């Protein structure tokens, strides 16, 4: 919706986090990754609000808030799933923090990151993780 947010504050609210990197003009892996996240969100049912889902744009020059909003709508993404963009430097910094940076966006690989809570280690799923695999990692993170 165009509001400025700080990623650390967004993902450190105590909820488990599910995160990936996408860009809206991608025609290869981004649509399937986004579809899979939508399936995960749907299958979470009543637990959906207990998980912070974040998709970070790796193409901030093109991915405006409006473009990301339209992209999210196309996949049925709903709160608390957020799509983030920012400066090129901020996008690169976040990608590097997750060891996911590729100088050429066309060369980016499908990665999924999950974390139970602030201070906990991140789980990294390399490749196009399917909804059952993501849910198998995520559901235990929801247990008390």
Predicted regions: what they are:
Residues 1-6, 135-144:
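Non-globular targeting/processing and membrane-anchoring segments
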Residues 3, 42, 99-101:
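Short beta-turn/strand-loop junction motif enriched in small, turn-promoting residues
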Residues 7-31, 35-37:
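Short active-site neighborhood of thiol/selenol oxidoreductases, capturing the structured segment around
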Residues 12-16, 48-53, 63, 107-110:
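Extracytoplasmic
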Residues 19, 23-27, 55-58, 80-81, ...:
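Second-shell loop/turn segments in exported
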Residues 20, 27-31, 62, 85, ...:
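Soluble non-cytosolic domains of exported or imported proteins
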Residues 32-81, 88-94:
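Structural microenvironment flanking redox-active thiols in thiol-disulfide oxidoreductases
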Residues 77-133:
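Thiol/selenol-based redox catalytic cores and closely related redox-interacting motifs
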């Amino acid at each position: 919706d165009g509001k400025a947010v700080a990623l650390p504050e967004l993902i450190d609210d105590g909820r488990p986090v599910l995160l990936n990197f996408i860009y809206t003009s991608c025609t290869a892996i981004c649509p399937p990754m986004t579809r899979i996240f939508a399936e995960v969100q749907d299958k979470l049912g009543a637990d959906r609000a207990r998980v912070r889902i974040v998709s970070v744009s790796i193409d901030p020059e093109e991915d405006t808030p409006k473009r990301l909003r339209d992209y999210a709508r196309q996949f049925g993404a709903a709160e608390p799933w957020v799509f983030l963009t920012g400066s090129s430097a901020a996008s690169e910094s976040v990608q590097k923090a997750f060891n996911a940076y590729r100088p050429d966006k066309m060369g980016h690989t499908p990665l999924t990151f999950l974390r139970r809570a602030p201070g906990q280690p991140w789980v990294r799923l390399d490749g196009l993780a399917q909804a059952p695999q993501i849910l198998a990692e995520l559901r235990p993170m929801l247990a008390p």
